Amino acid sequence: MKRVFYNVGELATATGSAAAAGRAQGTLLTLHNAWLLEENGVIAAHGEGTPPQADDSVDCRGKLVTAGLVDCHTHLVFGGWREHELAMKLAGKTYLEILAAGGGILSTVRETRNASEDALYEKTRGLYLEMLAHGTTALEIKSGYGLELATERKQLRVVRRLKEEFGDVAATFLGAHAFPEGTDHEAYVELLCSEMIPAIAEDGLADFCDAFCDDGVFSAEQSERVLLAGKRFGMIPKLHADEIREIGGTQVSARVGAISCDHLSETGAEGIKALRDGGVIAVMLPATSFYLKKPYGDFRGMIDAGVPVAVATDMNPGSTPNLSLPFAMTAGCLYGRLTPEEILTAATLNGAAAIGMAEKLGTLEAGKQADLVVWDADNLDQLIYRYGTNRAAAVFKKGVRVTGKE
């Protein structure tokens, strides 16, 4: 069946099937008084002026249309919440003080271990639907709140169930998220490499393997061992790095051939060069910097140096309980100094590339899956400018409306 989306005030899209870098990241195809033709869930054509005939039609009412957003870094499967930590943060308590009071990541680990798979699935499904309503049509979800095999498997089974129901969900094994309480650090790294990664791979539960390479967590050497072990078992490397301090994570990501390196709040010139030379996508997480009142990172410098940049929510219960990728886009423009055109590419094409889905998602081009959003905005600048409310008027996946305000 053919469906035409017509009366599009502005159609804005990145182009291509690989991450855009440098000047290309800020170069969009922009059409006015436009239409888009979808056939059997796939984009067939687009243009300006009089739309073609079709079996069905959608009046976009002169509004902005973009590709569906791709959130390439989330921690969506978790037990409990941590709102009780807010007062401690406002009182100036450090992370270590919050941890000592029974909070922090290890409190989420306890809650996640205690939750049933079905309870986690229902909670995660609800969060996914909220993200979908804000324009996110594909995403990545990490484990990392188990820190032992049974719970890591449980988290990744939840991700698999979500993928089976909705499609376009990438799974990342993040057993190297933190060290379990009372565990010898070297022994845990060995456990990850020799037992947990092989078991996760045998179950076919993860597309990617990630580690938190930073001060006080996993060293550069430990992170590299974990990522290489994952790579041997078919998991594509990703990395959390330079959120707290530079300890060589960007260089690790380049050496192991990581698809992305994320956070990067403290990355300097040498790290930027390593990312560029290694062909690694830099993922900015500005909503995390906003919530933690931490540096946003030199993503302007990264784009100018030719590093492809993606943007994601980092949705998690501790450092950014935010489901809205459009909010992260606005923060990325205001504090990461990206242009609206660059941030749209970051949230669509480059986000898709960071989870290996750019061949089918991330742009409104013929042959791509018809995932698109009609925004309650007249143009791209207005979408970024009018932050603070959900401006996704209608969300379509494979050409079918899945959510919207009307």
Describe these PLM feature segments.
Residues 236, 246-363, 375-381, 387-389, ...:
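Active-site-adjacent C-terminal substructures of enzyme catalytic domains
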Residues 60-123:
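Metal-associated gating/positioning segment near the N- to mid-region
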Residues 131, 199-200, 226, 230, ...:
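Generic structural signal for hydrophobic
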Residues 8, 36, 41, 62, ...:
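Divalent metal-coordination and catalytic microenvironments
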Residues 4, 55-59, 171, 395:
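Conserved beta-strand scaffold positions in the cores of enzyme catalytic domains, especially
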Residues 1-51, 380-382:
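N-terminal metal-binding scaffold of metallo-dependent hydrolase/deaminase domains
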Residues 392-406:
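Short peripheral tails and domain-boundary helices/loops at the edges of structured domains
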Residues 108-125, 137-247:
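Metal-coordinating catalytic core of metallo-dependent amide/deamination hydrolases
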